[in-house]
Amino acid sequence: INRTEETISQHFYWQNMQNDITKSVSTCAICQKQKKQRRKYGHLPEKEAEFRPWERLCVDLIGPYNIKSKIQGVKIPTLKCVTMIDPATGWFEVSQYDDKKSITVANIIEQQWLTWYPHPLLITLDRGSEFIGQEFCEMCENDYGIKRKVISTCNPQANAIVERVHQTLGNLIRSFELQENPYLDQDDPWSGILAATAFAVRSTYHTTLRAMPGQLVFGRDMILNIQHLADWTAIKAHKQDLIRKNNRIENAKRIPYQYKVGDQVMLENHQANKYEQPYKGPYLIQKVNTNGSVRLRMVAVT
């Protein structure tokens, strides 16, 4: 707006020129579709800290990891994994998979989690075909009565705990020299690496939890026979403080705005490359949810 006003004022002037330019630029549909905004609109609501163990399960896929061997002629197989985590305790499981078929992933989660631990009420996952396939949906809803919560690929923060575990997992995996460890199975070196990595995650102190995941699950230390009594009230309060702090930091970057039914909004096109139109729309808001999200009528307003 300022640059447009400065450019026009070099040659022209009229009464209420500033207001006219501001209104024209602010309501220009072409400008809003083509120019990418750095700041997002609307403050994010504060989430409630999770502190009930085994109530929710977060799952995702990680990989493929490809590591080149330093030994000539030795090829290290590609690593592809399913990761599972209880966000309340931080307890973590990881298992390799051969393909991304819905039935394959469903069997892994059933065998590596649902037959080992208390059944969750809710499972959080993304929109990958392996998670929305018929076999996976039937396992969750028909076999175990678990409600699925599908997050948007545009909002990975909704499954942020999994992303943090993936980062830790990647760091630990890269720290191993597979080909130089004589104790690893040369045909399947990843099985030993994943077992050691999972133990490292479970037995490491988490600042958010103020404990090790293993301590919260078993009530004792993972290495020494030392009892651990979890204060879930204090854990919840600490988690909520961190959520509140991060929420303030995130909202400080956003433009305050209260969405209303009937508003017209642009929808960001996350698949667009840098030369394509970054926004689509405008679309009409049909409903504003209590968590700050909105439901759109997916027919562009003309």
Functional labels for PLM-detected ranges:
Residues 95-96, 122-126:
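Short catalytic-loop micro-motif centered on adjacent basic/acidic residues
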Residues 39-58:
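Structured nucleic-acid-interacting core domains from mobile-element enzymes and related host factors
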Residues 21, 60, 90, 109, ...:
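Conserved hydrophobic/aromatic pocket- or pore-lining residues that grip, position, or stack substrates
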Residues 1-10:
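Reverse-transcribing Pol proteins
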Residues 14-32:
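Conserved short alpha-helical interface segments
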Residues 26-28, 35-38, 56-58, 120, ...:
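Domain-scale segment recognizer with a strong primary affinity
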Residues 77, 94-116:
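Active-site beta-loop-alpha junctions of metal-dependent nucleic acid enzymes
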Residues 53-93, 98, 271-272:
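An active-site-proximal beta-strand-loop segment
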